């Protein structure tokens, strides 16, 4: 038996939960099938039939028990039975759950996080690589090191200083030679002479090896002097 209530179709089970929607004949038939005695004055009034149906014939969760000793006893049994069903349902859900349920009560807000240190883990990767062959690091570490190690560190830096001084001397000599070959001052060009006259004597520049030897012997003032060309 299916009905239409408020433009919505209702199944038989839904109609059994709402006895006010059932007809008076259906209520009487249901009470007779349940072997519930119905008096003559109750048969006439539909409200009395619905109350009797709610007390005895409606499905158990929605049934209103009478307020007597039997009704109180049945209510206690119902509550005990519902509590058992809840515990069984909760244990089944916990068994299906992979992880336990975490409940935050708000009492502890600051928690300390512990990180397990590994022997050869991420800590070694975070360390900077050791720098080798740098004189600055060796000089920086020398005050903290012992007195025996300090002279060795200073001696190791001496060859580098000697090389730097030698390179500076070479560049200075090359600079002086270029200044000698191309003097910065203006040089007077000789007038053109006719063919057949006496040859002009020019002072030729010394070779490179002789120039280096003379540069070592001469004082620095002689290097900077401009050589003038002499004419006969």
From Swiss-Prot:
Ranges for region Disordered: 74-99, 113-232
Give me the stretches of Basic and acidic residues compositional bias.
74-97, 116-127, 163-179, 206-224
Disulfide bond residue pairs: none
Protein name per UniProt? Ashwin
| Self-association and partners | Component of the tRNA-splicing ligase complex.
Q: Which GO terms describe its biological process?
A: embryonic morphogenesis
Q: Which residues get modified to Phosphothreonine?
A: 197-198
Residue ranges, compositional bias (Polar residues) = 131-148
């Amino acid at each position: 038996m299916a009905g239409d209530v408020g433009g919505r179709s209702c199944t038989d089970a839904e109609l059994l939960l709402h006895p006010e929607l059932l007809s008076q004949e259906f209520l009487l038939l249901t009470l007779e099938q349940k072997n519930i005695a119905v008096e003559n004055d109750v048969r006439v009034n539909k409200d009395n039939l619905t109350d009797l149906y709610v007390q005895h014939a409606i499905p158990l969760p929605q049934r209103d028990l009478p307020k007597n000793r039997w009704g109180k006893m049945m209510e206690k049994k119902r509550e005990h039975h519902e509590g058992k069903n809840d515990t069984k349902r909760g244990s089944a859900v916990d068994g299906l759950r992979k992880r336990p349920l975490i409940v935050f009560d708000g009492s502890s807000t600051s928690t300390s996080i512990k990180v397990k240190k590994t022997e050869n883990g991420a800590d070694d990767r975070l360390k900077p690589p050791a720098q080798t062959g740098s004189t600055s690091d060796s000089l920086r570490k020398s005050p903290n090191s012992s007195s025996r190690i300090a002279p060795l560190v200073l001696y190791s830096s001496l060859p580098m200083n000697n090389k730097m001084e030698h390179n500076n001397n070479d560049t200075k000599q090359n600079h002086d030679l270029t200044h000698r070959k191309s003097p910065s001052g203006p040089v007077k060009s000789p007038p053109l002479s006719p063919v057949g006259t006496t040859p002009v004597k020019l002072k030729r520049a010394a070779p490179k090896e002789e120039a280096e030897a003379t540069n070592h012997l001469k004082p620095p003032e002689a290097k900077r002097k401009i050589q003038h060309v002499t004419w006969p």
